[in-house]
Curated annotation (Swiss-Prot):
Signal peptide as annotated in the record: none
Protein name in UniProt: 2,3-bisphosphoglycerate-independent phosphoglycerate mutase
Entry EC number(s): 5.4.2.12
The reaction(s) this protein catalyses: (2R)-2-phosphoglycerate = (2R)-3-phosphoglycerate
CDD domains: iPGM_like
Species of provenance: Methanococcus vannielii (strain ATCC 35089 / DSM 1224 / JCM 13029 / OCM 148 / SB)
Superkingdom of this protein's organism: Archaea
Keywords: Glycolysis, Isomerase
Segments forming a coiled coil: none
Chain's role: Catalyzes the interconversion of 2-phosphoglycerate and 3-phosphoglycerate.
Family matches, as Pfam families: Metalloenzyme, PhosphMutase
GO molecular function: metal ion binding; phosphoglycerate mutase activity
Length: 406
Protein backbone atom coordinates (compact mmCIF):
# COMPACT_ATOMS: atom_id res chain seq x y z
CA UNK A 1 0.00 0.00 0.00
CA UNK A 2 1.00 3.59 -0.68
CA UNK A 3 -0.20 6.88 0.76
CA UNK A 4 -0.79 10.48 -0.33
CA UNK A 5 -1.40 13.58 1.76
CA UNK A 6 -2.96 16.16 -0.56
CA UNK A 7 -2.78 19.61 1.04
CA UNK A 8 -4.85 22.48 -0.32
CA UNK A 9 -2.95 25.39 1.18
CA UNK A 10 -5.22 27.92 2.90
CA UNK A 11 -8.29 25.79 2.13
CA UNK A 12 -10.60 26.69 5.01
CA UNK A 13 -12.68 29.84 5.38
CA UNK A 14 -15.35 31.46 7.51
CA UNK A 15 -18.96 31.82 6.31
CA UNK A 16 -20.01 35.07 4.71
CA UNK A 17 -23.34 36.78 5.49
CA UNK A 18 -25.13 34.11 3.45
CA UNK A 19 -23.42 31.22 5.24
CA UNK A 20 -21.19 30.39 2.29
CA UNK A 21 -17.46 29.83 1.85
CA UNK A 22 -15.48 29.49 -1.39
CA UNK A 23 -15.22 25.74 -0.76
CA UNK A 24 -18.91 25.32 0.03
CA UNK A 25 -19.96 27.25 -3.10
CA UNK A 26 -17.40 25.79 -5.48
CA UNK A 27 -18.30 23.03 -7.92
CA UNK A 28 -16.34 20.18 -6.33
CA UNK A 29 -17.80 16.99 -7.77
CA UNK A 30 -14.67 14.93 -7.19
CA UNK A 31 -13.97 16.23 -3.68
CA UNK A 32 -17.55 15.36 -2.77
CA UNK A 33 -17.16 11.90 -4.30
CA UNK A 34 -14.03 11.31 -2.21
CA UNK A 35 -15.94 12.43 0.89
CA UNK A 36 -18.79 10.01 0.11
CA UNK A 37 -16.34 7.12 -0.32
CA UNK A 38 -14.07 7.93 2.64
CA UNK A 39 -14.08 8.64 6.34
CA UNK A 40 -14.40 12.34 7.16
CA UNK A 41 -13.78 14.74 10.00
CA UNK A 42 -12.30 18.11 10.85
CA UNK A 43 -8.68 18.79 11.67
CA UNK A 44 -6.51 21.40 13.34
CA UNK A 45 -2.98 21.08 12.03
CA UNK A 46 -1.35 21.95 15.35
CA UNK A 47 -4.01 22.27 18.03
CA UNK A 48 -7.43 23.74 18.72
CA UNK A 49 -7.21 27.51 18.76
CA UNK A 50 -3.64 27.60 17.44
CA UNK A 51 -3.11 29.66 14.28
CA UNK A 52 -0.60 27.68 12.19
CA UNK A 53 2.07 28.82 9.83
CA UNK A 54 2.43 26.78 6.66
CA UNK A 55 5.77 25.52 7.96
CA UNK A 56 4.59 24.34 11.37
CA UNK A 57 1.42 22.89 9.84
CA UNK A 58 3.29 20.77 7.31
CA UNK A 59 5.67 19.49 9.96
CA UNK A 60 2.65 18.37 11.97
CA UNK A 61 0.98 16.76 8.94
CA UNK A 62 4.16 14.73 8.42
CA UNK A 63 3.99 13.56 12.02
CA UNK A 64 6.65 15.82 13.52
CA UNK A 65 5.81 17.79 16.66
CA UNK A 66 6.42 21.44 15.67
CA UNK A 67 6.92 22.36 19.32
CA UNK A 68 9.99 20.10 19.29
CA UNK A 69 11.29 20.51 15.72
CA UNK A 70 10.43 24.07 14.69
CA UNK A 71 13.08 26.65 15.53
CA UNK A 72 12.07 29.31 12.99
CA UNK A 73 11.36 29.70 9.30
CA UNK A 74 14.93 30.48 8.27
CA UNK A 75 16.30 26.92 8.19
CA UNK A 76 13.47 25.67 5.98
CA UNK A 77 13.79 28.63 3.59
CA UNK A 78 17.54 28.00 3.34
CA UNK A 79 17.04 24.31 2.72
CA UNK A 80 14.34 25.06 0.16
CA UNK A 81 16.59 27.23 -2.01
CA UNK A 82 19.29 24.60 -2.15
CA UNK A 83 21.60 25.49 0.72
CA UNK A 84 22.98 22.38 2.40
CA UNK A 85 22.12 22.90 6.05
CA UNK A 86 23.75 21.24 9.04
CA UNK A 87 22.61 20.95 12.66
CA UNK A 88 23.81 24.02 14.55
CA UNK A 89 23.76 26.36 11.54
CA UNK A 90 21.85 29.61 12.03
CA UNK A 91 19.57 30.52 9.13
CA UNK A 92 17.36 33.43 8.11
CA UNK A 93 14.97 34.42 5.37
CA UNK A 94 15.90 37.78 3.85
CA UNK A 95 14.61 40.58 1.70
CA UNK A 96 16.75 42.64 -0.62
CA UNK A 97 15.65 46.16 0.33
CA UNK A 98 16.35 49.80 -0.49
CA UNK A 99 17.87 52.02 2.20
CA UNK A 100 19.38 55.48 2.37
CA UNK A 101 22.78 56.32 3.90
CA UNK A 102 21.28 56.24 7.39
CA UNK A 103 19.83 52.75 6.75
CA UNK A 104 16.30 54.13 6.64
CA UNK A 105 14.22 51.71 4.58
CA UNK A 106 12.75 53.36 1.48
CA UNK A 107 11.45 50.17 -0.19
CA UNK A 108 11.20 46.87 1.70
CA UNK A 109 11.26 44.83 -1.52
CA UNK A 110 13.68 46.93 -3.59
CA UNK A 111 11.02 47.72 -6.17
CA UNK A 112 10.29 43.98 -6.47
CA UNK A 113 13.61 43.53 -8.26
CA UNK A 114 13.45 40.47 -10.50
CA UNK A 115 17.07 39.31 -10.78
CA UNK A 116 19.49 39.44 -7.85
CA UNK A 117 21.86 36.66 -8.94
CA UNK A 118 24.79 39.06 -9.43
CA UNK A 119 24.17 40.67 -6.05
CA UNK A 120 24.12 37.24 -4.42
CA UNK A 121 27.73 36.66 -5.50
CA UNK A 122 28.88 39.69 -3.51
CA UNK A 123 27.75 38.12 -0.24
CA UNK A 124 27.96 34.36 -0.67
CA UNK A 125 31.20 32.95 0.69
CA UNK A 126 32.16 35.90 2.89
CA UNK A 127 33.87 35.15 6.18
CA UNK A 128 33.55 37.32 9.28
CA UNK A 129 35.97 36.19 11.98
CA UNK A 130 35.44 32.42 12.19
CA UNK A 131 31.93 32.47 10.72
CA UNK A 132 31.17 31.48 7.12
CA UNK A 133 28.41 33.36 5.29
CA UNK A 134 26.29 31.32 2.87
CA UNK A 135 23.82 33.44 0.91
CA UNK A 136 21.46 32.50 -1.90
CA UNK A 137 18.78 34.49 -3.68
CA UNK A 138 15.49 32.65 -3.94
CA UNK A 139 13.77 34.60 -6.69
CA UNK A 140 13.27 38.33 -7.01
CA UNK A 141 13.80 40.26 -3.81
CA UNK A 142 13.80 37.14 -1.62
CA UNK A 143 16.88 35.36 -0.32
CA UNK A 144 18.15 33.03 2.37
CA UNK A 145 21.14 33.54 4.65
CA UNK A 146 23.01 30.97 6.68
CA UNK A 147 25.79 31.46 9.23
CA UNK A 148 28.09 28.52 9.92
CA UNK A 149 30.70 28.49 12.63
CA UNK A 150 31.38 27.71 16.28
CA UNK A 151 29.43 29.08 19.20
CA UNK A 152 26.47 30.63 17.38
CA UNK A 153 22.96 31.17 18.74
CA UNK A 154 19.49 31.83 17.36
CA UNK A 155 18.57 33.86 20.44
CA UNK A 156 18.83 37.15 18.59
CA UNK A 157 16.36 39.73 17.29
CA UNK A 158 15.34 40.44 13.70
CA UNK A 159 16.60 43.38 11.66
CA UNK A 160 13.25 43.97 9.96
CA UNK A 161 11.53 47.27 10.90
CA UNK A 162 8.45 45.96 9.03
CA UNK A 163 7.67 49.44 7.66
CA UNK A 164 9.21 51.82 5.21
CA UNK A 165 10.50 55.05 6.71
CA UNK A 166 11.96 53.13 9.65
CA UNK A 167 15.62 52.32 10.22
CA UNK A 168 16.96 48.79 9.79
CA UNK A 169 16.97 47.45 13.32
CA UNK A 170 20.19 46.75 15.14
CA UNK A 171 20.28 43.06 15.96
CA UNK A 172 20.55 42.42 19.67
CA UNK A 173 21.05 39.26 21.77
CA UNK A 174 17.90 38.00 23.45
CA UNK A 175 19.70 36.29 26.29
CA UNK A 176 22.93 36.82 28.23
CA UNK A 177 24.95 34.15 26.47
CA UNK A 178 28.26 34.84 24.75
CA UNK A 179 26.93 32.90 21.75
CA UNK A 180 24.00 35.27 21.26
CA UNK A 181 26.25 38.30 21.69
CA UNK A 182 28.69 36.91 19.12
CA UNK A 183 25.96 36.10 16.59
CA UNK A 184 24.35 39.54 16.88
CA UNK A 185 27.75 41.18 16.43
CA UNK A 186 28.56 39.10 13.34
CA UNK A 187 25.20 39.87 11.77
CA UNK A 188 25.38 43.62 12.41
CA UNK A 189 28.81 43.69 10.79
CA UNK A 190 27.49 41.68 7.86
CA UNK A 191 24.73 44.22 7.19
CA UNK A 192 27.30 47.02 7.00
CA UNK A 193 29.44 44.96 4.64
CA UNK A 194 26.36 44.20 2.54
CA UNK A 195 25.57 47.90 2.16
CA UNK A 196 29.17 48.68 1.19
CA UNK A 197 29.26 45.94 -1.43
CA UNK A 198 25.76 46.40 -2.85
CA UNK A 199 25.21 50.16 -2.88
CA UNK A 200 27.71 50.89 -5.64
CA UNK A 201 27.27 47.60 -7.50
CA UNK A 202 26.76 47.96 -11.29
CA UNK A 203 23.30 46.40 -10.94
CA UNK A 204 22.28 49.20 -8.61
CA UNK A 205 24.06 51.89 -10.61
CA UNK A 206 21.93 50.85 -13.58
CA UNK A 207 18.78 50.86 -11.45
CA UNK A 208 19.55 54.40 -10.27
CA UNK A 209 20.02 55.50 -13.86
CA UNK A 210 16.62 54.02 -14.69
CA UNK A 211 15.04 55.64 -11.61
CA UNK A 212 14.36 52.27 -9.98
CA UNK A 213 14.74 51.41 -6.28
CA UNK A 214 18.15 49.93 -5.54
CA UNK A 215 18.75 46.63 -3.76
CA UNK A 216 21.49 47.87 -1.46
CA UNK A 217 20.62 46.10 1.80
CA UNK A 218 19.56 42.69 3.03
CA UNK A 219 17.12 42.47 5.93
CA UNK A 220 17.27 39.13 7.78
CA UNK A 221 14.33 37.79 9.74
CA UNK A 222 12.80 34.46 10.77
CA UNK A 223 15.98 33.30 12.50
CA UNK A 224 16.27 29.67 13.50
CA UNK A 225 18.89 27.11 14.39
CA UNK A 226 18.91 24.14 12.04
CA UNK A 227 17.22 21.37 14.05
CA UNK A 228 18.05 17.70 14.26
CA UNK A 229 15.10 15.86 12.71
CA UNK A 230 14.66 12.12 12.21
CA UNK A 231 14.52 11.51 8.43
CA UNK A 232 11.07 10.49 7.16
CA UNK A 233 12.31 7.19 5.74
CA UNK A 234 13.85 6.19 9.08
CA UNK A 235 10.82 7.36 11.05
CA UNK A 236 8.28 5.43 8.97
CA UNK A 237 10.20 3.04 6.73
CA UNK A 238 8.69 4.68 3.64
CA UNK A 239 10.37 6.17 0.60
CA UNK A 240 8.74 9.60 0.43
CA UNK A 241 8.48 12.45 -2.04
CA UNK A 242 7.08 15.97 -2.11
CA UNK A 243 5.46 17.97 -4.90
CA UNK A 244 5.22 21.69 -4.17
CA UNK A 245 5.67 25.02 -5.91
CA UNK A 246 7.01 27.07 -3.01
CA UNK A 247 10.48 27.07 -1.52
CA UNK A 248 9.27 26.84 2.07
CA UNK A 249 7.44 23.54 1.55
CA UNK A 250 10.34 22.18 -0.52
CA UNK A 251 12.64 23.13 2.35
CA UNK A 252 10.56 21.22 4.88
CA UNK A 253 10.57 18.23 2.54
CA UNK A 254 14.33 18.33 2.11
CA UNK A 255 14.84 18.75 5.85
CA UNK A 256 13.02 15.47 6.53
CA UNK A 257 14.61 13.72 3.54
CA UNK A 258 11.65 13.60 1.16
CA UNK A 259 12.60 13.62 -2.52
CA UNK A 260 11.50 16.94 -4.03
CA UNK A 261 9.86 16.45 -7.43
CA UNK A 262 10.26 19.52 -9.63
CA UNK A 263 7.22 20.24 -11.80
CA UNK A 264 7.44 22.70 -14.67
CA UNK A 265 4.94 25.52 -14.24
CA UNK A 266 4.25 24.76 -10.57
CA UNK A 267 4.50 28.28 -9.17
CA UNK A 268 2.35 28.20 -6.03
CA UNK A 269 0.09 30.92 -7.46
CA UNK A 270 -3.52 30.87 -8.73
CA UNK A 271 -2.23 30.50 -12.31
CA UNK A 272 0.02 27.56 -11.47
CA UNK A 273 0.03 24.51 -13.74
CA UNK A 274 -2.31 22.43 -11.59
CA UNK A 275 -2.67 19.54 -14.01
CA UNK A 276 1.10 19.13 -14.30
CA UNK A 277 1.17 18.55 -10.55
CA UNK A 278 -1.61 15.98 -10.83
CA UNK A 279 0.28 14.06 -13.50
CA UNK A 280 3.49 14.29 -11.48
CA UNK A 281 1.72 12.78 -8.47
CA UNK A 282 0.48 9.79 -10.45
CA UNK A 283 3.98 9.21 -11.87
CA UNK A 284 5.70 9.65 -8.51
CA UNK A 285 3.50 6.98 -6.92
CA UNK A 286 5.14 4.48 -9.27
CA UNK A 287 8.51 5.00 -7.58
CA UNK A 288 7.65 6.11 -4.04
CA UNK A 289 5.62 4.79 -1.11
CA UNK A 290 4.41 8.18 0.08
CA UNK A 291 3.79 11.58 -1.53
CA UNK A 292 3.06 14.90 0.12
CA UNK A 293 1.56 17.32 -2.40
CA UNK A 294 0.93 20.99 -1.64
CA UNK A 295 -1.27 23.14 -3.88
CA UNK A 296 -1.09 26.77 -2.84
CA UNK A 297 -3.22 29.05 -5.05
CA UNK A 298 -6.22 29.17 -2.69
CA UNK A 299 -4.02 30.52 0.09
CA UNK A 300 -2.80 33.40 -2.06
CA UNK A 301 -6.39 34.29 -2.96
CA UNK A 302 -7.29 34.23 0.74
CA UNK A 303 -4.43 36.58 1.58
CA UNK A 304 -5.67 38.89 -1.17
CA UNK A 305 -9.24 38.76 0.18
CA UNK A 306 -10.47 37.55 -3.22
CA UNK A 307 -13.47 35.24 -2.73
CA UNK A 308 -14.06 34.50 -6.42
CA UNK A 309 -10.43 33.64 -7.18
CA UNK A 310 -10.28 31.31 -4.17
CA UNK A 311 -13.43 29.58 -5.37
CA UNK A 312 -12.02 29.28 -8.90
CA UNK A 313 -8.73 27.83 -7.63
CA UNK A 314 -10.62 25.22 -5.60
CA UNK A 315 -12.52 24.23 -8.75
CA UNK A 316 -9.22 23.89 -10.65
CA UNK A 317 -7.94 21.67 -7.86
CA UNK A 318 -11.08 19.55 -8.18
CA UNK A 319 -10.16 19.00 -11.83
CA UNK A 320 -6.73 17.84 -10.65
CA UNK A 321 -8.38 15.40 -8.30
CA UNK A 322 -10.57 14.04 -11.09
CA UNK A 323 -7.44 13.09 -13.04
CA UNK A 324 -5.76 11.62 -9.97
CA UNK A 325 -8.78 9.51 -8.97
CA UNK A 326 -9.01 8.15 -12.50
CA UNK A 327 -5.40 7.01 -12.30
CA UNK A 328 -5.07 5.48 -8.84
CA UNK A 329 -6.76 2.45 -7.28
CA UNK A 330 -8.21 2.46 -3.76
CA UNK A 331 -6.85 -1.06 -3.32
CA UNK A 332 -3.33 0.34 -3.61
CA UNK A 333 -3.40 3.91 -2.25
CA UNK A 334 -4.65 5.66 0.87
CA UNK A 335 -5.48 9.25 -0.01
CA UNK A 336 -5.81 12.07 2.53
CA UNK A 337 -7.46 15.29 1.35
CA UNK A 338 -7.24 18.32 3.64
CA UNK A 339 -5.57 21.71 4.11
CA UNK A 340 -2.79 23.07 6.29
CA UNK A 341 -4.69 26.04 7.71
CA UNK A 342 -7.65 28.28 6.98
CA UNK A 343 -7.04 31.61 5.25
CA UNK A 344 -10.40 33.38 5.63
CA UNK A 345 -11.31 36.08 3.13
CA UNK A 346 -12.35 38.40 5.97
CA UNK A 347 -9.02 37.99 7.78
CA UNK A 348 -6.69 37.89 4.75
CA UNK A 349 -4.38 35.81 6.96
CA UNK A 350 -4.15 32.40 8.57
CA UNK A 351 -6.66 31.50 11.27
CA UNK A 352 -7.15 28.67 13.76
CA UNK A 353 -10.45 27.55 12.19
CA UNK A 354 -10.44 23.76 11.69
CA UNK A 355 -10.26 22.17 8.26
CA UNK A 356 -12.25 19.48 6.50
CA UNK A 357 -10.42 16.18 6.12
CA UNK A 358 -11.19 12.87 4.44
CA UNK A 359 -9.22 9.63 4.27
CA UNK A 360 -10.03 7.48 1.22
CA UNK A 361 -8.86 3.95 0.53
CA UNK A 362 -9.29 0.25 1.18
CA UNK A 363 -11.20 -0.77 4.32
CA UNK A 364 -11.77 2.72 5.74
CA UNK A 365 -14.99 3.05 7.72
CA UNK A 366 -17.11 5.01 5.26
CA UNK A 367 -19.52 7.38 7.01
CA UNK A 368 -22.62 9.31 5.91
CA UNK A 369 -20.89 12.55 4.80
CA UNK A 370 -21.77 13.49 1.22
CA UNK A 371 -20.01 16.85 0.72
CA UNK A 372 -16.46 18.04 1.31
CA UNK A 373 -16.64 21.41 3.04
CA UNK A 374 -16.12 23.08 6.42
CA UNK A 375 -19.65 22.29 7.62
CA UNK A 376 -20.31 18.74 6.41
CA UNK A 377 -17.21 16.72 7.24
CA UNK A 378 -17.48 17.43 10.99
CA UNK A 379 -20.29 14.84 11.05
CA UNK A 380 -17.93 12.09 9.93
CA UNK A 381 -16.28 9.16 11.64
CA UNK A 382 -12.88 10.78 12.17
CA UNK A 383 -14.48 13.39 14.40
CA UNK A 384 -11.99 16.13 15.38
CA UNK A 385 -8.31 15.28 15.02
CA UNK A 386 -4.94 17.03 14.97
CA UNK A 387 -2.42 17.09 12.16
CA UNK A 388 0.00 14.89 14.07
CA UNK A 389 -2.63 12.09 14.08
CA UNK A 390 -2.66 11.69 10.29
CA UNK A 391 0.59 9.76 9.79
CA UNK A 392 -0.09 7.28 12.63
CA UNK A 393 -3.55 6.63 11.13
CA UNK A 394 -2.01 6.04 7.69
CA UNK A 395 0.75 3.83 9.06
CA UNK A 396 -1.86 1.71 10.83
CA UNK A 397 -4.07 1.45 7.74
CA UNK A 398 -1.00 0.39 5.73
CA UNK A 399 -0.34 -2.42 8.21
CA UNK A 400 2.96 -0.96 9.37
CA UNK A 401 2.16 0.12 12.93
CA UNK A 402 3.55 -1.60 16.00
CA UNK A 403 1.35 -2.74 18.85
CA UNK A 404 1.60 -0.72 22.05
CA UNK A 405 1.54 -3.19 24.90
CA UNK A 406 1.07 -6.96 25.10
Amino acid sequence: MKAVIFVIDGLGDRPDEFGNTPLKEANTHTMDKIAKEGICGIMNAIDIGVRPGSDTAHLALLGYDPYETYTGRGPFEACGVGITVKPGDIAFRCNFSSVDKEFIVTDRRAGRIEDTSLLEKELDGLKIDDVEVIFKESGGYRAALLLRGPNLSDKISDADPKKEGKKVKEIIPLDDSKEAEKTANILNRLLKVAYEKLDGHPVNQKRRTNNLPVANMIIPRGVGKVPEIIPFDKKYGLKGACIAGTGLIKGIAKMVNLDVIEVKGATGTPDSNFMAKAKALVETLKTHDFVLINVKGADEAGHDGNYEVKKQVIEKIDEMLTYIMENIDRKDVYFVLTGDHSTPIEEMDHSADPLPIVIWGKSVRVDDVEKFDEFSTCKGGLNWIKGKNIMPILIDLMGLSKKYGA
